[in-house]
Amino acid sequence: MKVIFLQDVKGQGKKDEIKEISDGYARNFLIPKGLVKLATEGSVKTVKNRKIVQEQEKDLAIAETKQLKTLLEEIILKFKLQINEGKAFHSISNQDIVDQLKNSHKIDLDKRKFVNFKNLNQIGLHYIVIKLGFGIEAKLKVEIQGV
């Protein structure tokens, strides 16, 4: 019996997968529990169309992420730290960076996307790695100046 999986079934199939299953297993277990439905021409077309739409949405999201990466890598964020005798009285946290990106560049990021981030308290140019998703990482430049 040809069925369409409505959700993931361990050892059998994944959601929206079309697969041939034994009649008894499908009728007695999978269909009554709402895990699968019969694969008719209309339902198969619907599943294929849904997969095409999902693929297009994923491609669009990847393109937007790549565009965000390009934008982030062009930005240089500047912070000023009060320094006395070579020691900083304050440090720049990932939340400070997120806030400045949001306020000055209208870019909204989650502070948990920063890779191996440690608060910045040294004068100079720092590179921050940010995971954007889909395996794409951006290097943001942060310049700290002493006051």
From Swiss-Prot:
Gene assigned in the entry: rplI
Keyword rRNA-binding included in the entry's annotation: yes
UniProt entry tagged with the keyword Metal-binding: no
GO BP terms in the entry: translation
Record-linked InterPro entries: Ribosomal_bL9, Ribosomal_bL9/RNase_H1_N, Ribosomal_bL9_bac/chp, Ribosomal_bL9_C, Ribosomal_bL9_C_sf, Ribosomal_bL9_N, Ribosomal_bL9_N_sf
Assigned protein family: Belongs to the bacterial ribosomal protein bL9 family.
GO cellular component, one term: ribosome
Source superkingdom: Bacteria
GO MF, one example: structural constituent of ribosome
Protein name, as recorded: Large ribosomal subunit protein bL9
Function according to Swiss-Prot or TrEMBL: Binds to the 23S rRNA.
